[in-house]
Each structure stands twice: as structure tokens, then as C-alpha cells.
Amino acid sequence: MKIETIKYRKERKMRLIIVRHGDPNYEIDSLTEKGWREAEFLSVRMEKQLQKEHTYIYTSPLGRAKDTAYLTLKKLGMTATEFKWLREFEAPAIDEDTGTYKVCWDLLPARWTSEPAYYDKDQWMNTPFMKKAKADTESAWVYDGLDSLLKKHGYTRENGYYRAEHANRDTIVLFCHFGVECVMLGHLLGISPVVLWHGTAAAPSSVTTLYTEERREGIASFRMQSFGDLSHLYAADEPASFAARFCETYDNMAERHD
């Protein structure tokens, strides 16, 4: 397999890179054989793209995220800091439509689209389902964790933007999970995570990149340059995993149903 066809440039700018773990084996909280291949192709990309001396890597405490990070860390000769708030977003509740426990990102379209609050960045956690799931407490924990990390790197949250108290060109890499990724993106971009959970799919090993913009001195915001990028898989002729998606047509029993 050829995995050098895409040339990645090592850039010096303030970046926040969010990496979803490789194809998961949830039974053992690790990766499938395919997931390990994805992690290897990802590590080749990361080695080419990152400057070790300006890169800081953080991981979820869950095995599938740490295993995905392992090969990148090995190639770079680095270690990662583990944060509990980077674990998968835990806010399940009984779904009225099915009578079973559902995670926040698996609600049926007819359910979540009928409640205007789900589209609101400040009200999405106040719907009956999200209240039962205690999504307000869980999301506040993630918001606080992310803001504390960014403050450590020189950016302090103020209203909907960040004060650039020490503007810099660090690269922050977070190895984590789709659910918590959307919560962080919602916080940074001012979007309800419910819209992101149900309207996007960051496939396993995908890379999402955000940059800071400081158009006025001391006032910074984040802009997403790419979401769910899989160029490292395309370069290696490795197909994307179907994980995080449901059946494209109801009659296709080979694809995920609920």
C-alpha cells in the first residue's frame, strides 16, 4: 500500500486537532484489526504533519482512544496527558419512542427535529430527554475541561470568544470520541451539539482541525478548517468505517439499524 501520495506540510500556527479513535471493538474497549490499520496510517500522517517541539497531545482515558494515540506517540517519541473529560460523552436516558436507553446522538429524526430547543446552543440540554440524561452537568464538565486546557495554552474564554492572553502557535491534539468531539465543537463554534451529532459523522480515525483567528489584538475565535478528514485512509486505499452511521436505506439489512 502506498501511503506517501499526499504530502503533509509541517505548519506553525495555533491549531486544535481532534482525532476520533480508530474502528472500535467496544467489547474490549480497543480497536478492531481495521482500527489498528487506521491508527497506523494516521500515525504516518501525524509524523509528517506535526512539529514535536510545538505539539501537545492529550487523550481520553478509554482504551480505544489511547490505542489510537499510541502509534502516533511512538513515532513522535512523545507521551500524552490523559483527561477524564475527554472520555465519551455519557448522558443516556430512556427514549420515549423505543422505551430503551439511548445516547444523545442516536435520537430519531422525527423526535429531535420537532423540538426547537435542540437547535439552540444554549437550550438544547433543557429538553425533557436531555434533562433525564443530565446532559447539562456532563456538557458543563466538558466545557470547563476544554476551557481550562485552552487557558493553559494562552486563551481564556470570555462570552463566546477567547482572550488571547498569550497568543501562540501551539498545536493541541485531542484523541477522543465522536460524541464528546461534537460537544467541544459546539462550544467553540456556537452550535448546538445535537445538530452536529445527528447531521455529521466523524468516521473512525478522522481528523478535525480548527485554527485560531485574532482579527483584533487580544480577541480570538476558532474557525474549523476541516471536519472528519480521512485523507490518510484514502492515501492508503483503506475504506472508511461505517461506524457512527445508520442504514442509508431501510431495506439494507447489511447496514446498521436500531
Enumerate the language-model features and the residues they cover.
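Acidic, low-complexity terminal tails and accessory targeting/binding regions
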Residues: 2-13, 89-107, 161-171, 183-258
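Phosphate-handling substructures
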Residues: 77-153
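Active-site-proximal alpha-helix that buttresses catalytic centers in soluble enzyme cores
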Residues: 2-87
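GST-like fold's C-terminal all-alpha helical module
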Residues: 143-166, 170-178
